[in-house]
Amino acid sequence: MRVVPLGFESLGVRSMATLIETPDVTVLVDPGVSIPPKRYNLPPSEEEWEALEEVRESIQRAADSADVVTISHYHYDHHTPFTDRKYEACDLETAKELYRDKLILMKHPTENINRSQAGRARALIEGLDELGVDYEFADGKRFEFGETVLEFSQPLPHGPEGTRLGYVLGLRITHRDHVIVHASDVQGPVYGPALEWILERDPDLVLISGPPTYLLGFRFSSDNLEKAVKNLRKLASRSGQIILDHHLLRDKNYRDRLSEVYEESDNVASAAEVLGKEERLLEAYRDELSGEE
């Protein structure tokens, strides 16, 4: 299997967009990208706007070759809406080009979902219906494409158990004896059953969102950080390569905060590192890029 990270925080944007190719099917996972309107009470830097456009173009190019699009949940950095959105670099035509002639495997729009995401899901489905594409709600389901199998988890919390941020779907893709797990927004994982679901899949490669340490003491507790570190250490000791990115890399000091994880295994890296690129933590360094440190 060929795995191409398209957009992650280490590449300068909010995203976990990934292209996964097997001999049977090409899958575009979580095709969304965004940058936050405010960080440190500052607007995006010029470098962030450029990175947003670059990743959007990468996602659109990847969509040209994809047969299947998967959507783990309905935050805008994980799917592309049928609306004009400046901070997501998209409009109606962007979405049409992305989803046209694809099979969309997506999280259920009304079950295990909060009000905000339910509204976004409803709008997305309206757009897909107008476009006339096929879609299925994938929660807990399995889909076969030749010797390739896509297996979705039951809904997992978007971080700690009881979070108001809703639920996400984990995705396992297998081809013969090769196994990849894409675990969007599990924030560590913090939630024990999310870790167990990943470990039971016995992955060669895991793409996972780390804990949002930039929110520590505000929307993310020290207790949850301890759980995330413990679970990540266990994951690092029992799986192959781990691409650890997304929420975690919104923090300038992410390596120090998760030093125990990086000491556990040499196989933990950011998407940029796996691609052989220099990390671009543009959101984390917005204050310095804006000259207002």
Curated annotation (Swiss-Prot):
Family affiliation: Belongs to the UPF0282 family.
Organism of provenance: Methanopyrus kandleri (strain AV19 / DSM 6324 / JCM 9639 / NBRC 100938)
Protein name stated in the entry: UPF0282 protein MK0213
Top-rank taxon: Archaea
Gene3D superfamilies, per the entry: Ribonuclease Z/Hydroxyacylglutathione hydrolase-like
InterPro entries for the chain: RibonucZ/Hydroxyglut_hydro, UPF0173_UPF0282_UlaG_hydrolase, UPF0282_hydrls
